[in-house]
Each structure stands twice: as structure tokens, then as C-alpha cells.
């Protein structure tokens, strides 16, 4: 960082990365005289916008990771989630410690070289969670092995095949993500230190080898000493990150349940099968959510103003995977394969029979910002001065809300430690990933073992497949 106390910082994006970083900036004396601006495109004036990945009825809050570094970081964040005072992050229903059943199948699926299996992830996650629980003095029965399909069925009240091996972590839970982001926005706004601008950042502006701001959709320009891009799945439209970070869409749906059914389901843990990617979250009100944490849908499209890798290169049209949300138009239905798969999830993971036959009350695509290894990208751009990137959530950033902004700032200041190493800008191993090759888009695949099949699906192609399911 050229100036450790810049006069101005522009943050593009008000999701969990952007908003938590703004909050962290307001709390550090080093930035007491720094002007902080957050810009995002929101039709309602609400920050963050409703189609942001951080805004939803629920996000899983878990230390259950195959990587012990994330287990440790998530366990640290959970200390804040567990605080239940009205003004605390976890208060007023923002956090619920329902427990989590993590499971997978033993099936010998054909995975591409380098992709870890879901069962690998589950067993490593169990090992890491047990170690952290022992370290923190938690009772041994808080994490219980479910070593067979029968044991899983007994725990869940099902009579299906929810998995072949798994465990119940009673120390995990879920957060109402929309409520959590509202809590965070209110904290940031109350400081009086942050200016919020409702506009779309169309492109980054430069002067020589330095990024100096952003041009907005209304033609205005915002200037800053440091530009921090935290635009989630939209980051690839502003910066050429092909092969490093890629937008992928993930399906979720809601059905209506009765009061009697809700009384049963609200006592259930979250259930997540890492082979299929299917999971259910205990209901809120009378709405039950089922979703799929998979490799996701690609949506290739041309962008015209992405910042090239270095000042020696000209901006040119490139093809990247782009989010498609309600601001782009109403899809109106799920792809057929997603409809079938989500209903399979309800049938296998729920103790109540027949839920899979009900109509969807609501469906959505949640857009991740994926990386190959599941590690985020939080680093200075190597080709441009003044440009810091905080993206690549890979579908698992929200749970770190209480400390994410501080970790981003640590990386910005060159004090990121082991996480700075994980999240640094990485050289590409395959230059064809994230690009069109012979007319076909070669999507990035997250290979950490946390994703369920299928892989390589293109949204437009899947929507064309018969029969479409009206919702």
C-alpha cells in the first residue's frame, strides 16, 4: 500500500465483503481521516441490493471445513454470532444454533483429476471440528458420528438414503442473512463515516498505471486514492479475472408447510449432502428452503469494459460468466434438472413424506464468485496500482461477517498472515479456463470437495431443455 492512510477509499459492492470492510475501516484509527464511499446498484435504495448473494432467508454458519484454517476462522466468527443481545449480531433471531448434519455418499463417482470427493471433505471436516471443540472445552457429545445410512436415518427421522456416513455437529447453525446484512448496514451507516452511492459502476477509470476511480452508469465518475472492488459475482465485469474468479448460479427453492409440519421441521438440524450438494434449512414461518451447493450454472456473455491485466493491454470485449438476476429479467422457472434434483432433496432429507410434490412458492438463483480452490481472492492487483480486490467468496463467505472486514484490511496492509497467503493473487495453471475454446466456454471448477454434481451446466442450455417447470 503506497500510502498507509489514504485520503479516500472507494468500495464497489455492498455485499458482505464490501460492507464489512467499510465497517472495519471506520473502527481503525489509521483510517480516521480517510473518506469512505460505497457504491452499489440497487433499484430500491436498499444496501445491499436484494439480488446480492449475502441477502437471503438463511446462510449456514459452520466451522465444518476440510481446511483447518477455515475451521479456526469460522469458530472465531461464531463467538460473535452466539451473542444474543438485541443489539448483538446473533440477537433477535439473526442466528439460530440448530445443528448441522454433514454427510456424503461412498459412491465411486468419476471426478476430474484434482477434484476432492464429498466424502473426503466430510471426514476431514469432522476431524477438524472435533479438534476445535476439544480445544474450546466443548462436551464430546456435541459432535456425534453417524457412521451409516441407518444412523443418519435415526438422527433425521427419515427412511431414505440421506448419505452413507456423516456426523451431527450441534455447534453449527444458520443465520437469517437478510437480517444480518441489515444489522451490518445499520452499524456502518450509524458511524456517519461512510457515504453510500446508489449507482452501477460501469468501469474502472485509470491514469497511467494507476486505477483512480470508477465511471458510473449515469456518466458520473467517482475518484479515490484506493479502489477496492468487492462486487461479488459481478467482479468479472469490471476486472479481467478469467481463470481466477467466475460467476456461477446456484438454485434454491421454497415450499409452504403447515404449522404442524413446521413444529416438526423446526427441530431438525440443517442437512447437507456434499456428494449431491443438496441441503435443507429449518423453516422460518411457514417456508421451508431446499437448495443445492454445486458447481453451479455458467452464463457466458460478452463484457466490454473489463480492466485488462496490465496497462500495456487494451480493453477489449471478453466473454465471462455473468450473473442473471431479477434486475436482468424474470426467468420464471427452474431448469428441469434442478427442479427434479431439489425435489429429490426434499424426499431424501426431510422426515415428512410428500413435501417433494408441492409447488414452489419461490425460487431463486444465488450467484457465487467462484475460485478453483475455494480460497478467496483478497489482494492488490499485480498489474495496477491503487486497485485492491476482495472477492471469490466461493459460496462460503457470509459466515465470517463478524471478522471478514478486518481480515480484508489486514491483507491490504500486508499483514494477512496465513490467510493473506491463501487469498493472494495466483498464477494460472491453464490459460484456457474461463475462456471460449472452439466455440465452447470452459468454465472454472471449484475442486475443494464441497460441491455436489453436476458440473459444467450452462444456464441458457438447461432452461431450453424440456419439460420446463412453471413456478
Describe every region a protein language model picked out.
Residues 10-12, 39, 214, 221-235, ...:
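Short hydrophobic core segments
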Residues 23-28, 91-99, 221-226, 231-386:
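Active-site substrate-recognition segment that forms the wall
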Amino acid at each position: 500500500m503506497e500510502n498507509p492512510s489514504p485520503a479516500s477509499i472507494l468500495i464497489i459492492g455492498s455485499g458482505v465483503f464490501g460492507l464489512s470492510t467499510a465497517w472495519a475501516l471506520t473502527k481503525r484509527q489509521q483510517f480516521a481521516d480517510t473518506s469512505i464511499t460505497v457504491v452499489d446498484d440497487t433499484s430500491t435504495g436498499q444496501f445491499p441490493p436484494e439480488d446480492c448473494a449475502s441477502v437471503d432467508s438463511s446462510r449456514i454458519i459452520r466451522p465444518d471445513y476440510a481446511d483447518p484454517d477455515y475451521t479456526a476462522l469460522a469458530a472465531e466468527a461464531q463467538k460473535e454470532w452466539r451473542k444474543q443481545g438485541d443489539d448483538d449480531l446473533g440477537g433477535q433471531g439473526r442466528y439460530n444454533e440448530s445443528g448441522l448434519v454433514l454427510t456424503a455418499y461412498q459412491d465411486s463417482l468419476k471426478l476430474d483429476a484434482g477434484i476432492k470427493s464429498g466424502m473426503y471433505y466430510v471426514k476431514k471436516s469432522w476431524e477438524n471440528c472435533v479438534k476445535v471443540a476439544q480445544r474450546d472445552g466443548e462436551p464430546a457429545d456435541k459432535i456425534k458420528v453417524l457412521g451409516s445410512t441407518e444412523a443418519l436415518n435415526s438422527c433425521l427421522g427419515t427412511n431414505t438414503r440421506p448419505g452413507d456416513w456423516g456426523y451431527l455437529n450441534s455447534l453449527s447453525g444458520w443465520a437469517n442473512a437478510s437480517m444480518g446484512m441489515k444489522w451490518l448496514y445499520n452499524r456502518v451507516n450509524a458511524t456517519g463515516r461512510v457515504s453510500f452511492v446508489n449507482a452501477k459502476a460501469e468501469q474502472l477509470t485509470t491514469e497511467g498505471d494507476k486505477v483512480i476511480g470508477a465511471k458510473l452508469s449515469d456518466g458520473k465518475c467517482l475518484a479515490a486514492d484506493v479502489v477496492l472492488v468487492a462486487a461479488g459475482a459481478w467482479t468479472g465485469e469490471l476486472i479481467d479475472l478469467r481463470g481466477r474468479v467466475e460467476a456461477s448460479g446456484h438454485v434454491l427453492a421454497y415450499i409452504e408447510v403447515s404449522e404442524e409440519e413446521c413444529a416438526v421441521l423446526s427441530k431438525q438440524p440443517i442437512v447437507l449432502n456434499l456428494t449431491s450438494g443438496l441441503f435443507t434449512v429449518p423453516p422460518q414461518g411457514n417456508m421451508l428452503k431446499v437448495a443445492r451447493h454445486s458447481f453451479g450454472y455458467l452464463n457466458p456473455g460478452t463484457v466490454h469494459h473489463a480492466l485488462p491485466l496490465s496497462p500495456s493491454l487494451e480493453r477489449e470485449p471478453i466473454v465471462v460468466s455473468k450473473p442473471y438476476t431479477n434486475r436482468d429479467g424474470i426467468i420464471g422457472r427452474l431448469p428441469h434438472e434442478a427442479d427434479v434434483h431439489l425435489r429429490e432433496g426434499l424426499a431424501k432429507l426431510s422426515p415428512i413424506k410428500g413435501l417433494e410434490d408441492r409447488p414452489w412458492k419461490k425460487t431463486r438463483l444465488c450467484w457465487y464468485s467462484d475460485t478453483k480452490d475455494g480460497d478467496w481472492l483478497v489482494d492488490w492487483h499485480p498489474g495496477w496500482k491503487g486497485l485492491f480486490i476482495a472477492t471469490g467468496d466461493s459460496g462460503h463467505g457470509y459466515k465470517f461477517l463478524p471478522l471478514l472486514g478486518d481480515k480484508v484490511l489486514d491483507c491490504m496492509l500486508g499483514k494477512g498472515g496465513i490467510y493473506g497467503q491463501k487469498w493472494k493473487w495466483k498464477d494460472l495453471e491453464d490459460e484456457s479456463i474461463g475462456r471460449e475454446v472452439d466455440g465452447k466456454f470452459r468454465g472454472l471448477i471449484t475442486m475443494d470437495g464441497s460441491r455436489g454434481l453436476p458440473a459444467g451446466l450452462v444456464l441458457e442450455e438447461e432452461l431450453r431443455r424440456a419439460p420446463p417447470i412453471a413456478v
